[in-house]
Amino acid sequence: MITNRKGGAMEITNIETIPGKKITTHYGVVCGSTVRSKNAFKDIGASFKNMFGGELKNYTRLLEETRQEAISRMIQQATALGANAIVNVRFATSDVAAGAAEIYTYGTAVRVE
């Protein structure tokens, strides 16, 4: 359960239904995406870390923030339609330019009771 920007609750799941609830209305596909680029200065540190192994924490943080922004945009779209849940949520990524990647999330906006 995620609270949307209007203060209401939005249930989000990667399965077709919300367990224990009935879908009463389908609003269709909703999506959210954002494109982020890497920081050139942080890339220098990441290059050294990459040579010796280990987690690239700056990239991990960047991807988490990017995912959250894409989810937030998807929730905004679903809320505007009157949905209180999003089912079948999926994520996709793609390179859109040198050093820049898109995270795209999508699902089906529904109303559940």
What do the predicted segments below correspond to?
Residues I2-K42, A80, A101-E113:
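N-terminal presequence-like segments and the immediate start of the first folded domain
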Residues I15-I18, F91-V96:
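Short, solvent-exposed loop/turn elements at beta->coil junctions and helix N-caps
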Residues V30, V35, D43-R90:
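Short, well-ordered alpha-helical segments
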